UniProtKB/Swiss-Prot annotation:
SUPFAM superfamilies: Calponin-homology domain, CH-domain, EF-hand, Spectrin repeat. One of its GO terms (cellular component) is nucleus. This is Alpha-actinin-4. Homodimer; antiparallel. Identified in a IGF2BP1-dependent mRNP granule complex containing untranslated mRNAs. Component of the CART complex, at least composed of ACTN4, HGS/HRS, MYO5B and TRIM3. Binds TRIM3 at the N-terminus. Interacts with MAGI1. Interacts with PDLIM2. Identified in a complex with CASK, IQGAP1, MAGI2, NPHS1, SPTAN1 and SPTBN1. Interacts with MICALL2 (preferentially in opened conformation); stimulated by RAB13 activation. Interacts with PPARG and RARA. Binds to VCL; this interaction triggers VCL conformational changes. Interacts with SEPTIN14. Interacts with IGSF8. Ca(2+) binds at D778, D780, E789. F-actin cross-linking protein which is thought to anchor actin to a variety of intracellular structures. This is a bundling protein. Probably involved in vesicular trafficking via its association with the CART complex. The CART complex is necessary for efficient transferrin receptor recycling but not for EGFR degradation. Involved in tight junction assembly in epithelial cells probably through interaction with MICALL2. Links MICALL2 to the actin cytoskeleton and recruits it to the tight junctions. Residues 50-154, 163-269 form the Calponin-homology (CH) domain. Residues 1-30 are annotated as: Disordered. The modification Phosphotyrosine is found at Y31. InterPro entries: Actinin_actin-bd_CS, CH_dom, CH_dom_sf, EF-hand-dom_pair, EF-hand_Ca_insen, EF_Hand_1_Ca_BS, EF_hand_dom, Spectrin/alpha-actinin. It comes from Pongo abelii.
Length: 911
């Protein structure tokens, strides 16, 4: 062991007594992949971290105490690497390199690295665990490192039925606790929370230490503490867990539980070995009782097995090949049936025979009896020799079957490949000879010939591409012959037919190319003429079609200028007809030249010109149609010209009248507006003047009737515009109606003003003053004032409606009187009504009551005598008949209530 006293005087260790840990050989790759589920990318759950700290600390101290030391804080006490190296020496029983002296960080890192290198030398992959993290006291990395050490030196070698360490430990726990009620170990976390599993493990091996039947599942803390205390006191297993932590954690830390449970496994391993030995003795004793029976069974089994081997070997050595894969597959199926059905029982018999023989010999030897000697030829070695001969024959037979099947599969694959390629080739060549022999070029046009040549070139490319397939077909046929394919004759026949046909296609291809090229040259001259004809015929045909469309086009004109423009364009078109006729003759001459060349060279032209569908017949037919349409167009244009001249006369006639009536209406409207604003003279004079003006307007009505008649003629002629006037009939009608409405409204306003003046007692001067003020602020002369204009008018008349709170309130009150509908406008009539109320006596109930009070001598009632004395007789009797008796405290006989009578007159109460 390393001398730690020299490295650090703060640690006083005694002589080393390295424990026999779980260290040893063996690869850690698969083990670590299954067991080390430490997740270094995630933070530990606080509860789990707490459990791990306690458990791992206790586990480390259980080994460090063998060296006379211990740790208190797991992430602090390993920082210098000294106790970490000591822990590894104790649990491995090996010596580590000497630690470095000094307490500097570099010394600590080097010591930790020595420990980590030692762990890595045991086949452990330390992923993301570095010496710096351990020296820095990284709790997560330190716990991860200790867990890795626990896995390697405490759990790795636990194996039950070839399971991994974790699974083996779990299986061991399940088997040991299986007989116990309320215990079902399925994992290393929640299965241990109630403590019964810990107690069951102890009771299974040391029943005298635990009274299991007295434990209750609903008291987990007591159960856990009982198990921990018994384990610490009697089994020398330190207390690594807290009962409260386990119970209060939804899922206890799996690593902490595994570490603690592994201590039980190592503590009870000796007892388990004793149990195994006892079972072995029982089995030996049981076998000893059956020795004689086994001897008889051996003899019979050996005879039967040897006989079966002697019968089977000749069948396996039969290597006669078959012709088809189906036959070989049947032999393979028979062999598989032998392996599946016949041989397994014999393997079992042989195995049982050897087991019985070995068991029998062992039992006899242990019981000091002479060894069993089978009959001659029936020794185990004889059976093994026969079995080896059988397996050798079997192995060779299987190899032969597979080779034969592979050979036949190869042959079948090649044959199928040959058939597929041959079928594809034959399908491709089908009809190719007939195509190459076809003399379709003899009646083809030049474009057809060129298309046939391009098609033939494509075929030649396709033919060259298929050369590889023909060569592949021949190569496959050759390989089938070399492999002795059973149907080689048919393959060779088919291959020869394909090759002969291929040679014939090559010869026909060459002949057809020569014929196509010869025909192409003969047709090029004619084609050039056809092309020239098409180039000139197409635009000429388009010109004729456009001309016919234009000549037949329905024209819609509305002015004389438009029809004159159409006539001018038509005259210009007629001037181009001689040139067009010359072009027509030239085009027809080209066609005749092509016909002459074809006839002189005995060429049979198939169909019409390939470049155009415009034939000479079409050109002549359309030319004749153009000649017929020209005079028709002349006649139609002249008729339309006459019509437009008549329409122009109607326009001018209407315009001359409308240009008089329209301004007259506009002038009258302006004069009425001026009269309504100026209002010179008395209201009666103004009313008389306006009525005379109205009669003059009505007298003008015949002029509108005449205009209506002219408008009717325009509508019948479908004339929609008139550039000679800006006035439409609708415009005239609307203006006339507005004129009549305006003069009537103005007369009505004057009449209302007269009524207001007479009712309110307004003088003529006041009325003119009101009109002057209103007109002054009516800037747009619209006959109404807006709110701001009305406010300015009121201010000019002395009203206090300034922009303060009191002025705004007064203005709003006045606006509610003059504009009750809230239209935002104040008419002159509303303005007059308001001003008359403000400047004349108010005819109200209060005023009448005050008058009656004067007649009554300031009393609250009046008598009949007073009424008859002050009022005319009829009015006095009217009041006496309708006045109610006065009911006040100061009433006298015959007193009448003049107040209720006055309010009733104005509808403020009932009579």
């Amino acid at each position: 062991m390393v001398d730690y006293h020299a490295a650090s005087q703060s640690y006083q260790y005694g002589p080393s007594s390295a424990g026999n840990g779980a260290g040893g050989g063996g690869s850690m790759g698969d083990y670590m992949a299954q067991e080390d589920d430490w997740d270094r990318d995630l933070l530990l759950d606080p509860a789990w971290e707490k459990q791990q700290r306690k458990t791992f600390t206790a586990w480390c101290n259980s080994h460090l105490r063998k060296a006379g030391t211990q740790i208190e804080n797991i992430d602090e006490d390993f920082r210098d690497g000294l106790k970490l190296m000591l822990l590894l020496e104790v649990i491995s029983g090996e010596r580590l390199p000497k630690p470095e002296r000094g307490k500097m960080r570099v010394h600590k890192i080097n010591n930790v690295n020595k420990a980590l290198d030692f762990i890595a030398s045991k086949g452990v992959k330390l992923v993301s665990i570095g010496a710096e993290e351990i020296v820095d006291g990284n709790a997560k990395m330190t716990l991860g490192m200790i867990w890795t050490i626990i896995l390697r030196f405490a759990i790795q070698d636990i194996s039950v039925e070839e399971t991994s360490a974790k699974e083996g430990l779990l299986l061991w726990c399940q088997r040991k606790t299986a007989p116990y009620k309320n215990v079902n170990v399925q994992n290393f976390h929640i299965s241990w929370k109630d403590g019964l599993a810990f107690n069951a493990l102890i009771h299974r091996h040391r029943p005298e230490l635990i009274e299991y039947d007295k434990l209750r599942k609903d008291d987990p803390v007591t159960n856990l503490n009982n198990a921990f205390e018994v384990a610490e006191k009697y089994l020398d297993i330190p207390k690594m867990l807290d009962a409260e932590d386990i119970v209060n954690t939804a899922r206890p830390d799996e690593k902490a539980i595994m570490t603690y449970v592994s201590s039980f496994y190592h503590a009870f391993s000796g007892a388990q070995k004793a149990e195994t030995a006892a079972n072995r003795i029982c089995r030996v004793l049981a076998v000893n009782q059956e020795n004689e029976h086994l001897m008889e069974d051996y003899e019979k089994l050996a005879s039967d097995l040897l006989e079966w081997i002697r019968r089977t070997i000749p069948w396996l050595e039969d290597r006669v090949p078959q012709k088809t894969i189906q036959e070989m597959q049947q032999k393979l199926e028979d062999f598989r049936d032998y392996r599946r059905v016949h041989k397994p029982p014999k393997v079992q018999e042989k195995c049982q025979l050897e087991i019985n023989f070995n068991t029998l010999q062992t039992k006899l030897r242990l019981s000091n009896r002479p060894a069993f000697m089978p009959s001659e030829g029936k020794m185990v070695s004889d059976i093994n020799n026969g079995w080896q001969h059988l397996e050798q024959a079997e192995k060779g037979y299987e190899e032969w079957l597979l080779n034969e099947i592979r050979r036949l599969e190869r042959l079948d694959h090649l044959a199928e490949k040959f058939r597929q390629k041959a079928s594809i080739h034959e399908a491709w060549t089908d009809g190719k000879e007939a195509m190459l022999k076809h003399r379709d070029y003899e009646t083809a046009t030049l474009s057809d010939i060129k298309a046939l040549i391009r098609k033939h070139e494509a075929f030649e490319s396709d033919l060259a591409a298929h050369q590889d397939r023909v060569e592949q077909i021949a190569a496959i046929a050759q390989e089938l012959n070399e492999l002795d394919y059973y149907d080689s004759h048919n393959v060779n026949t088919r291959c020869q037919k394909i090759c002969d046909q291929w040679d014939a296609l090559g010869s026909l291809t060459h002949s057809r190319r020569e014929a196509l090229e010869k025909t192409e040259k003969q047709l090029e001259a004619i084609d050039q003429l056809h092309l020239e004809y098409a180039k000139r015929a197409a635009p000429f045909n388009n010109w004729m079609e456009s001309a016919m469309e234009d000549l037949q086009d329905m024209f819609i004109v509305h002015t004389i200028e438009e029809i004159e423009g159409l006539i001018s364009a038509h005259d210009q078109f007629k001037s181009t007809l001689p040139d067009a006729d010359r072009e027509r003759e030239a085009i027809l001459a080209i066609h005749k030249e092509a016909q002459r060349i074809a006839e002189s060279n005995h060429i049979k032209l198939s169909g019409s010109n390939p470049y155009t569908t415009v034939t000479p017949q079409i050109i002549n037919s359309k030319w004749e149609k153009v000649q017929q349409l020209v005079p028709k167009r002349d006649h139609a244009l002249l008729e339309e010209q006459s019509k437009q001249q008549s329409n122009e006369h109607l326009r001018r006639q209407f315009a001359s009248q409308a240009n008089v009536v329209g301004p007259w209406i506009q002038t009258k409207m302006e004069e009425i507006g001026r009269i309504s604003i100026e209002m010179n003279g008395t209201l009666e004079d103004q009313l008389s003047h306006l009525k005379q003006y109205e009669r003059s307007i009505v007298d003008y009505k015949p002029n509108l009737d005449l205009l209506e008649q002219q408008h009717q003629l325009i509508q019948e002629a479908l004339i929609f515009d008139n550039k000679h006037t800006n006035y439409t009939m609708e415009h005239i009608r609307v203006g006339w109606e507005q004129l009549l409405t305006t003069i009537a409204r103005t007369i009505n306003e004057v009449e209302n003003q007269i009524l207001t003046r007479d009712a309110k007692g307004i003088s003529q001067e006041q009325m003119q003053e009101f009109r002057a003020s209103f007109n002054h602020f009516d800037k747009d002369h619209g006959g109404a004032l807006g709110p701001e204009e009305f406010k300015a008018c009121l201010i000019s008349l002395g009203y206090d409606v300034e922009n303060d709170r009191q002025g705004e309130a007064e203005f709003n009150r006045i606006m509610s009187l003059v504009d009750p509908n809230h239209s935002g406008l104040v008419t002159f009539q509303a303005f007059i009504d308001f001003m008359s109320r403000e400047t004349t006596d108010t005819d109200t109930a209060d005023q009448v009551i005050a008058s009656f009070k004067v007649l009554a001598g300031d009393k609250n009632f009046i008598t009949a005598e007073e009424l008859r004395r002050e009022l005319p007789p009829d009015q006095a009797e009217y009041c006496i008949a309708r006045m109610a008796p006065y009911q006040g405290p100061d009433a006298v006989p015959g007193a009448l209530d003049y107040k209720s009578f006055s309010t009733a007159l104005y509808g403020e109460s009932d009579l």
